[in-house]
Amino acid sequence: MTVQTSKNPQVDIAEDNAFFPSEYSLSQYTSPVSDLDGVDYPKPYRGKHKILVIAADERYLPTDNGKLFSTGNHPIETLLPLYHLHAAGFEFEVATISGLMTKFEYWAMPHKDEKVMPFFEQHKSLFRNPKKLADVVASLNADSEYAAIFVPGGHGALIGLPESQDVAAALQWAIKNDRFVISLCHGPAAFLALRHGDNPLNGYSICAFPDAADKQTPEIGYMPGHLTWYFGEELKKMGMNIINDDITGRVHKDRKVLTGDSPFAANALGKLAAQEMLAAYAD
């Protein structure tokens, strides 16, 4: 007999009126083992350049009915690109807006993955003790050692990042100084920080999680309610072109902006980013 899993969001007892995704949605969109593969970089980078990860520092996202979605950065979307980049020779640092610890969607952690989990444990202290983004921004100049800014996905990227002047300054620095910008799924919501000033991403094309898909996820209990705004609509208003309208694991390169559509694109985005950065920073 087939056991039907519930489509009701699961209660997060750590906060009032907060919820994790339903058992059903987790059965459809998470796995205990990732699809990590193709980690083959025989001539890794040996220089000083590294990645700046701008991570989420808030867990609870209000929805239209007042319920809170218990979110953060998606582990697959964070760790698979970093696994590839690290294997290709690029170390990374983590920063959050507040300087407080990164929040992860632990319900999506590939807890049986024999490569990803040791990698996470090895670097957990970076996520637990991040830099404060304002301090990083204050030190940026043309000679800074960051080769790329990486904004992971997860609905946590919708909280704070789109309004942050420090996020805007970091992105402006990256584009103007010919550095890479890497993001996927909901991570490009951070680009909205550029709305109210100098916007060097005007005219760029990206992949991102479709608004249409976000509007469907409450039906299966992934979120306990609908979003109060949709980042894709806002990105288009600021002159960006989202080239996908579905979720296929697609990645895209527009100059040095590298993006993916969902967690299904995390491995491919990691490969693309590693290859592009190795080509740019070859010894």
Swiss-Prot record:
Assembly and oligomerization: Homodimer.
Induction, per UniProt: By heat shock.
Entry superkingdom: Bacteria
Location(s), subcellular: Cytoplasm
Principal place of residence: cytoplasm
GO biological process, one term: methylglyoxal catabolic process to D-lactate via S-lactoyl-glutathione
One of the record's GO molecular function terms: protein deglycase activity
Catalytic activity line of the entry: N(omega)-(1-hydroxy-2-oxopropyl)-L-arginyl-[protein] + H2O = lactate + L-arginyl-[protein] + H(+); N(6)-(1-hydroxy-2-oxopropyl)-L-lysyl-[protein] + H2O = lactate + L-lysyl-[protein] + H(+); S-(1-hydroxy-2-oxopropyl)-L-cysteinyl-[protein] + H2O = lactate + L-cysteinyl-[protein] + H(+); N(omega)-(1-hydroxy-2-oxoethyl)-L-arginyl-[protein] + H2O = L-arginyl-[protein] + glycolate + H(+)
InterPro entries, A to Z: Class_I_gatase-like (IPR029062), HchA (IPR017283), Prot/Nucl_acid_deglycase (IPR050325)
The keyword Protein transport is annotated on this UniProt entry: no
Assigned keywords, A-Z: Cytoplasm, DNA damage, DNA repair, Hydrolase, Metal-binding, Stress response, Zinc
Protein name: Protein/nucleic acid deglycase HchA
